[in-house]
Structures are given as C-alpha cells and as structure tokens.
C-alpha cells in the first residue's frame, strides 16, 4: 500500500498510480497521452471529493496523524520570516518536542510555539513522537512570558497525542508544568492565537492552547483522550476506536458547533499533506486577520474576553 494514502483512500491511490504509469510511458516513447492523463486526473479529483465529503470521525482522526501531514516547522517555513529558534527551559534541558522562537508575520514580531513530531525514526525519537516532557512546557512558558515582556503576540501550533506519560516526566512534575502554563496563559497581557494543525491530545495540547482565538484545521482533532484510549476504557478494547471517535465529538466541525472552536480553516482537497503551501496560505490569512482584530483591544478588554471565553466552556 502507498504510504501517502490511508486505506480508505486506496481507490484514489490506484488512480494516481495509473496516472504516474502513463506519464512514464509518455516520457519514454514521446507519446502524447495528455488527454487520458487529464481524464484520469479529473476522475481522481471527483473521487477524492466524494470520499472526503463523507469522512467519519475516525477517518478524520487518522488523517490528523497522517505521516506526511505538515508539522509546526513546515508551517513556520511557509508562513513566517526571520524565524530565530530559542532553546531550553533554564531549569533542566531543552525538549525537542516543543519548538519556539521569534519570527515576523507581515513585518509584525511574533512569538511562535508549537509541538513538533519527526518524520524519520531517529527524528521521531528525538522529538519524542511529539509528546513533550515538563521541560518542553516550561520552555514554552518562558517564551510566552518573554513575549509578554516585549509586547509580542503569541501564536501556538498544536499537534500532539498528549503530554509524555513516562516516569521521568512524572518525576519532574508533568502535571505541575501543564497547570502552571494554564495559569500563566490565562493572565498574559498579549494576544494569543492557537491553531490545531493535527492531533490535539488532552492536557498536552491544552498546555499551549489557552488563547483568545482557537482555530482548527479541517482534518484535525481535539479531545481529552485518544479514540483508542477511550475505547480501551469503555469497551476494554481499542478495536472500538471508531465508535469512540464518533461519540467523543473530536472533529473541528463538531467542536465549532459546541462553541469551543472559533474558526475551522479549510484544507486543500485530500488534506493539508497534498498541498502544504496552500494549507499554510489559508492559515496565514486567518492569523493576519485575527491578529489585527485582537491588537485593537486594550489589555483589560483582552483579558476579560479571554476569561469569559474560558468560563463559557461546558455551558
């Protein structure tokens, strides 16, 4: 199976394979088979629209984890200029599962913080599969307080299965690090915009997710636990993950309907991994618009609005 396609995308993968074969034949024999390639490409696009027009919550959860999906550093490269990464929590070490630093958006200095996963095995291990340890969240907190001091807006990118649950993380007080971030972010006197770009997993996501504006990409998820974890608790088997995903309401559209998410950002046909530049352009446009709106508010109004937003959850 083509690793660029999930199992429910297999009919699309088959068509794309035929298109590639025709292109190779045309290149080798100087044949003009453009009409047939165009016909198959149109058929592929129609099939993609049909499949993606009726995705289940579980299929969206799997898209959110797609191995080719753009990560935080990919979006930084496409959206921002003059990015200067900052390292370390000034207490223990630097956690590569959280990246952050100063950059410019439309010439405006901003602080960027986000989860980062890896692509290859070695990089996945170095990034701890996008699961931060306490030092990652303390690094994020340090950068957020720096942003407040220098009056820079904070833009966070959420993409994690959750905070790392290992013994070493618990020994360094993982829960305290997350709780402290929630406390600090609720009071920061600078605009905060959070965007879920993949998985939004539990407290590991929320630790950089307290904000004035919450965006979700169309095929991202946000939940207190993974569908597999929920299924294992309720049904004693992870095979019920699809049922759990549907019951939990983890998708962007469901969360928008509940008033938790402010904006669902559309993705290119087939998902952000099909056209990362287009996905980044959509995010950039929303960030620019939202930042301009938030910058019009004074600090008292900003904090009061943030407080009311948080207190409205669950009502």
Curated annotation (Swiss-Prot):
InterPro entries reported for this sequence: Acetyl_CoA_COase_a_su (IPR001095), ClpP/crotonase-like_dom_sf (IPR029045), COA_CT_C (IPR011763)
- List the gene name: accA
Which GO BP annotation is one of this protein's? fatty acid biosynthetic process
Name assigned to this protein: Acetyl-coenzyme A carboxylase carboxyl transferase subunit alpha
| Disulfide pattern | none
Q: How does it assemble?
A: Acetyl-CoA carboxylase is a heterohexamer composed of biotin carboxyl carrier protein (AccB), biotin carboxylase (AccC) and two subunits each of ACCase subunit alpha (AccA) and ACCase subunit beta (AccD).
Chief subcellular location equals: cytoplasm
Which SUPFAM superfamilies does this UniProt record tie to the protein? ClpP/crotonase
According to UniProt, the reaction catalysed is: N(6)-carboxybiotinyl-L-lysyl-[protein] + acetyl-CoA = N(6)-biotinyl-L-lysyl-[protein] + malonyl-CoA
Q: Note the HAMAP family from the entry.
A: AcetylCoA_CT_alpha
Sorted alphabetically, the keyword list is: ATP-binding, Cytoplasm, Fatty acid biosynthesis, Fatty acid metabolism, Lipid biosynthesis, Lipid metabolism, Nucleotide-binding, Transferase
């Amino acid at each position: 199976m083509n690793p660029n396609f999930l199992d429910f995308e297999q009919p699309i993968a088959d068509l794309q394979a035929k298109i590639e074969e025709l292109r190779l034949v045309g290149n080798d024999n100087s044949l003009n088979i453009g009409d047939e390639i165009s016909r198959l490409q149109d058929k592929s696009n129609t099939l993609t629209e049909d499949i993606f027009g009726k995705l289940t919550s579980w299929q969206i959860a799997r898209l959110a984890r797609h191995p080719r999906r753009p990560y935080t550093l990919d979006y930084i490269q496409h959206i921002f200029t003059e990015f200067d990464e900052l390292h370390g929590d000034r207490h223990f070490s630097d956690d590569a599962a959280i990246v952050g630093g100063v950059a410019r958006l439309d010439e405006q200095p901003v602080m960027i913080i986000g989860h980062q996963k890896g692509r290859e095995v070695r990089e996945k291990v170095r990034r701890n599969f996008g699961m931060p340890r306490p030092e990652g969240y303390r690094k994020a907190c340090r950068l957020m307080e720096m942003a407040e001091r220098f009056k820079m807006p904070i833009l966070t990118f959420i993409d994690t299965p959750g905070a790392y649950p290992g013994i070493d993380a618990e020994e360094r007080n993982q829960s305290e690090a997350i709780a402290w971030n929630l406390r600090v972010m609720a009071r920061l006197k600078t605009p905060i915009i959070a965007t879920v770009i993949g998985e939004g997993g539990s407290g590991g996501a929320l630790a950089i997710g307290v904000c004035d504006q919450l965006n979700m990409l169309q095929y991202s998820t946000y939940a207190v636990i993974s569908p597999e974890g929920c299924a294992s608790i309720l049904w004693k088997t992870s095979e019920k993950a699809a049922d759990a995903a549907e019951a939990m309401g983890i998708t962007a559209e469901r969360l928008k309907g509940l008033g938790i998410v402010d904006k669902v950002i559309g993705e290119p046909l087939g998902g952000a991994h099909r056209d990362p530049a287009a996905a980044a352009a959509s995010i950039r446009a929303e960030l620019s618009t939202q930042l301009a709106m938030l910058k019009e508010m004074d600090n008292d109004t900003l904090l009061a609005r943030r407080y009311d937003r948080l207190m409205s959850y669950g009502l």
